[in-house]
Amino acid sequence: METTTTTLGGGGGGRAGGFSDPPSPLSPPLSPASAAAAALANARWTPTKEQIAVLEGLYRQGLRTPTAEQIQQITARLREHGHIEGKNVFYWFQNHKARQRQKQKQQSFDYFSKLFRRPPPLPVLHRPLARPFPLAMAPTAMPPPPPPPATTTTAACNAGGVMFRTPSFMPVATNNASYYPQQQTPLLYPGMEVCPHDKSTAQPPATTTMYLQAPPSSAHLAAAAGRGAAEAEGHGRRGGGAGGRETLQLFPLQPTFVLPDHKPLRAGSACAAVSPTTPSASASFSWESESSDSPSSEAPPFYDFFGVHSGGR
């Protein structure tokens, strides 16, 4: 069985053995006034309403970080409304600035959050129902339209309207106008006119000039009527009148042409003259009897249409 022996040595051995140093002597006790002052200094500051109102008024005036001299002046002023220290004034300004910055940041964050989350609705303007103009200023009737110029004549349909338009016409072409196209109209031949060969006359065709003219008026109608009458009279002269026309049979059984007395022709000869320049074609045919010993030249010639005398060829 082993025994443990403890060796007592100097101060170093006592610390090593677990013994502590002797306690230091206590500070002298405080007086009751000093103890009360220390308790007030360590106590939490509770500002009164008057002190808060004075400090907020200084902050609104632009005071943010007061100097040491300003802190002393403010502390002396606030002590009239309750207990306060200089450090309380300094910390109040620091905390109030931080709270204001935090409040502004929160307001900005809330504003942009609402803006991005859902746009605000468009404002609706509520207007009371009212007339476009007062009753005293309301016109009783529409003003009359301005009168047209004295030199122009307006259409009858625009007499009571608000728009007046002057009639315009194309200029009337002159006889020697070079910029109007001239062309010949085709001549129609309604029927074949038969007349003796010696009475056929060759006349130049009548050309018709077409112009772009203005709308018909009394002067233009009169001129057109005069031209139509002149042309009808000219055609009557050239055609020899309605009494000189004959209607030929499609398959005649007897000779239809008569030889002229003063102009003998050979047997079997045919003379057909058609004038292409006249508006109506004239044709004359003359036939002589096949037998040269005809007793009389006055007898009508005979023409074998069906080839009886020639053997049916």
From Swiss-Prot:
Residues 1-32, 224-247, 271-313 are annotated as: Disordered. One of its GO terms (molecular function) is DNA-binding transcription factor activity. Residues 40-104 bind DNA. Residues 271-301 have a biased composition (Low complexity). It holds the Pfam family Homeodomain. One of its GO terms (biological process) is plant organ development. Keywords: Developmental protein, DNA-binding, Homeobox, Nucleus, Transcription, Transcription regulation. Its main location: nucleus. InterPro entries: HD, Homeodomain-like_sf, WUSCHEL-like. GO terms for cellular component: nucleus. Residues 8-17 have a biased composition (Gly residues). It is found in: Nucleus. Residues 22-31 have a biased composition (Pro residues). Gene3D superfamilies: Homeodomain-like (1.10.10.60). Transcription factor which may be involved in developmental processes. Belongs to the WUS homeobox family. This is WUSCHEL-related homeobox 5. It comes from Oryza sativa subsp. indica. The gene is WOX5.
